[in-house]
Amino acid sequence: MSRIEKMSILGVRSFGIEDKDKQIITFFSPLTILVGPNGAGKTTIIECLKYICTGDFPPGTKGNTFVHDPKVAQETDVRAQIRLQFRDVNGELIAVQRSMVCTQKSKKTEFKTLEGVITRTKHGEKVSLSSKCAEIDREMISSLGVSKAVLNNVIFCHQEDSNWPLSEGKALKQKFDEIFSATRYIKALETLRQVRQTQGQKVKEYQMELKYLKQYKEKACEIRDQITSKEAQLTSSKEIVKSYENELDPLKNRLKEIEHNLSKIMKLDNEIKALDSRKKQMEKDNSELEEKMEKVFQGTDEQLNDLYHNHQRTVREKERKLVDCHRELEKLNKESRLLNQEKSELLVEQGRLQLQADRHQEHIRARDSLIQSLATQLELDGFERGPFSERQIKNFHKLVRERQEGEAKTANQLMNDFAEKETLKQKQIDEIRDKKTGLGRIIELKSEILSKKQNELKNVKYELQQLEGSSDRILELDQELIKAERELSKAEKNSNVETLKMEVISLQNEKADLDRTLRKLDQEMEQLNHHTTTRTQMEMLTKDKADKDEQIRKIKSRHSDELTSLLGYFPNKKQLEDWLHSKSKEINQTRDRLAKLNKELASSEQNKNHINNELKRKEEQLSSYEDKLFDVCGSQDFESDLDRLKEEIEKSSKQRAMLAGATAVYSQFITQLTDENQSCCPVCQRVFQTEAELQEVISDLQSKLRLAPDKLKSTESELKKKEKRRDEMLGLVPMRQSIIDLKEKEIPELRNKLQNVNRDIQRLKNDIEEQETLLGTIMPEEESAKVCLTDVTIMERFQMELKDVERKIAQQAAKLQGIDLDRTVQQVNQEKQEKQHKLDTVSSKIELNRKLIQDQQEQIQHLKSTTNELKSEKLQISTNLQRRQQLEEQTVELSTEVQSLYREIKDAKEQVSPLETTLEKFQQEKEELINKKNTSNKIAQDKLNDIKEKVKNIHGYMKDIENYIQDGKDDYKKQKETELNKVIAQLSECEKHKEKINEDMRLMRQDIDTQKIQERWLQDNLTLRKRNEELKEVEEERKQHLKEMGQMQVLQMKSEHQKLEENIDNIKRNHNLALGRQKGYEEEIIHFKKELREPQFRDAEEKYREMMIVMRTTELVNKDLDIYYKTLDQAIMKFHSMKMEEINKIIRDLWRSTYRGQDIEYIEIRSDADENVSASDKRRNYNYRVVMLKGDTALDMRGRCSAGQKVLASLIIRLALAETFCLNCGIIALDEPTTNLDRENIESLAHALVEIIKSRSQQRNFQLLVITHDEDFVELLGRSEYVEKFYRIKKNIDQCSEIVKCSVSSLGFNVH
């Protein structure tokens, strides 16, 4: 059991904050009494115990009022510390420390808990561990061996909460639930109930899922069977396709070879036709070209080429000169651009220089204006009007410098005067301050000495106070030492360690027997569980057999009518497959016919599309040709338009020739008419009658001569256009022939073919519709039979599985034969629990005996330690008594020194006050002097700075003016203006030269145009001769193609080609049908495999088996949970009733031995089950109340009892709860237990407490703490042999709580 040994308190409530104020209390066993007046700090000790154990603050405080008030201590920070030394449930020594700090802020106090420390002593070594508050709380509850609720409400119950057993119902229920730990067990039951409900729901879900998994498993088996069948059919189909492909390859190769040869023949035929057309066109072109030419050159080709090349050289020479002129013109243009660029740059530079000149004049005006302004400000004569010469400006600068120096000198003199006055004033201030500082140091020094002397005096008085009771304490120590030695001897004599050890050995043997029995029960449980699995499997198999019988019946009833209508009877799988095979063969034949018709229809549709496309292409081609012809001709009458254009070209050629010779003729006529000897017309030889008539003819000829070159140029241009149009129309001659062929032959033939193909398509569609109708009748029968085949296959598989299940049922039945199953799992489990309970009881007894052995050994060790501590304390007190006389003399001496220091400090403070007044006056005078100095200095500096700024601006303008003159900007400006005029003159000369070159180029172009007419005639001759050569080559090539074509056997190739196409079509038709079947099989296999890969069919059998196992296991788990729930519920009820019975028994005994009234026989706690809980809610709740009984009548005490009865009842209930629940912790604290009790009940309470102590005196760990102000009550307790010392709580001269240990005998002396 755990027990507390020592506790120290510092800085808590009224306990002091200095180290010397730390109070230490050692707790006695079995009784510790704390006595003191109200407000002395008794309850604080209980609050400290509760805080150190649970971390909870007293009611009504959050911690800041729990710590010593900083305002009272006159400190900013106050630290509080509580240390407790105790032994845990294992007897190990533990020390716990909790610290707090309270900081005084401006308006409120701030509280903070510091990190706690736990120190354990193991093997003679101390191990410390810093922990957070929550961790310390858990560690304390674990070490003390009781719950936090018991610590708060039973062991260390605060005085304000001491009457909680008679509080209102809800609060009372909460307290009792926490003490009984009922909340945890109720939550455990609720969790079990919820888990059981969840598991039951899961079983239903598993059953539903199992139903679907079974269907998926059966469907997956059916799909696998179908895949196997289709894969066999696919293999056969692939072999047929392969044979067709082997036949087809050599025929395709031969057909390709023949088609290549036919293509070659077709190409030769097309080339011959093209050459014929080309030859005809070339002959026609040559004839037209000869007609267009005025005459044909009769010389050799060499002569024609020489003449043409010489003419070209002449033209090229003239063109070269034209290029040279153009190059010269480009050069002049480039030179003009450069001059224009230079002109622009010079204009920009001229503008920039003009701007600088304007700015220069502006700077001169600004400088003169600033000089006039500053001269006026400084009252300088001779500077009233500008502009100013250089000599005037130098004189101005000299005068300004003199004025600046004078102003600066005046300002410096004024500052020096002020500095002397300030130094004098500071000297006076320093003298006063030195005197004041000296007095301050004296006061501070004397105060420090005073403080030290006061502390020394306080410590000496404290030591004397501690030594006051030392003489009595030595006598007490002698008595305590004799008693301790007597108790040690008695404990060693009464020790029964050996007997307890023998009892432990006996209990260990009994425990070993129980362990063996439990192992046997475990083996029996395992065997029963194994047979339970066998029975479960038997049930599953029987259920599976019934399911399969039902499935077979359903399949037969579902398809019986349908199969009978198709076959005339209900077939088995093989019979149905044979019928399906014959029906499938019929369907395939129909499909083959349908595929052949579809292929023919597709071929006809393709042929129709081809004819439509060809017809559309021919019509578009015709439309395009007609549009092109119309764009060139302007009408559709191509031949007449071409003849008319040729006539116009001929006329234009003649006109061109006439105009070409007109210039020479008109010139000759004019020469003849102007000749004085010639006065008649050169053409008609008519004589002119008058000179005016002659001049009129000359003028007309001259006019025509001037217009002739332009008319020639216009005529040549028109002629070129017409020739170009003629060439274009000649190029369209083949297109015109194509238009005629398209209209008269090709398009009508294609339209006839299209009508024939449409008739074939309609016939094929009728045949296809007939076959599809037949197929639509057969296929539903096949599909219906296939659906039935699936279920028939499943039915046969069910029949096979049914045989297997019947075999397994027989095997499981054989396993269960000869097995005795009278004992169930529940019976064995019940017996196992009983044995386990006995084993736990024996283990607890062993542990208790070991604990008693350990307690007796520790008690003897503790008594030895107590004896040694008393001897050591006696020696220490004897030593301290020898210093008493010395301390009294020291007290008198220190008191005298303190009084003297008080007087000296007071005198010094009286001298400081007049010095402070004088110092303040001198400082104010100095401040005024500094302000005047700063003001005067600012005025002088502002004036000087203004002059400097204006002089600086004048210098800036002067610098800019000098830089302009030194850089020669004015001369540079004039130079740039001269350069600009020169560039403008050069630009004008360049433009004149360009005009002359343009005129020369115009004359050259006219001459070259005249030469081009002769060049065209020579070119036409060369073209004609070249075309004649090409015509000969075309004739030769045509003859060669005819010869090559005659060597090929065209008719035999076409016949063979037709036969090959027919053979290939037949094979392809069969091949396509085979491929269609193959593709159908592949698609069905892929479909089945894809379906098998779907989540519901993948691993369907494994999922079904696993789900069956999970469902059965969950059902067994749910049964176990139900058993455990009921067992736990019964255990909770049994524990609750047993504890309540035990508590009420103790309460009755204590009440009867304590209460002296006759109105109440005894009291007890009633716990009633909650009657308002619904039937569906199986959670158990208890409502608690305290009742008082008189005879057979029970009344609620709450609201009916007196204040004294209420206190006594609460106290007795706490004592009963402590005795019941504090098995590992024998501590209980009673704070003012005599409140509201009369003398008779106080005496009976003291008697009852003594009896409790007596009954628990064998437990060395039992500790009762009693806090009271009633010294009579203490004296009553002191009459027992268990109380020799008690603690008196009082306040010292500093109003801090102190704990003083006193003897009970002295209390009795004082009382009486």
Curated annotation (Swiss-Prot):
The modification N6-acetyllysine is found at K959. The modification Phosphoserine is found at S635. Its cofactor is Zn(2+). Changing K42N: Abolishes ability to degrade ATP. It is found in: Nucleus; Chromosome, Telomere; Chromosome. The zinc-hook, which separates the large intramolecular coiled coil regions, contains 2 Cys residues that coordinate one molecule of zinc with the help of the 2 Cys residues of the zinc-hook of another RAD50 molecule, thereby forming a V-shaped homodimer. The two heads of the homodimer, which constitute the ATP-binding domain, interact with the MRE11 homodimer. It is linked to Nijmegen breakage syndrome-like disorder: A disorder similar to Nijmegen breakage syndrome and characterized by chromosomal instability, radiation sensitivity, microcephaly, growth retardation, short stature and bird-like face. Immunodeficiency is absent. This is DNA repair protein RAD50. It comes from Homo sapiens. The lineage of its organism: Eukaryota, Metazoa, Chordata, Craniata, Vertebrata. The gene is RAD50.
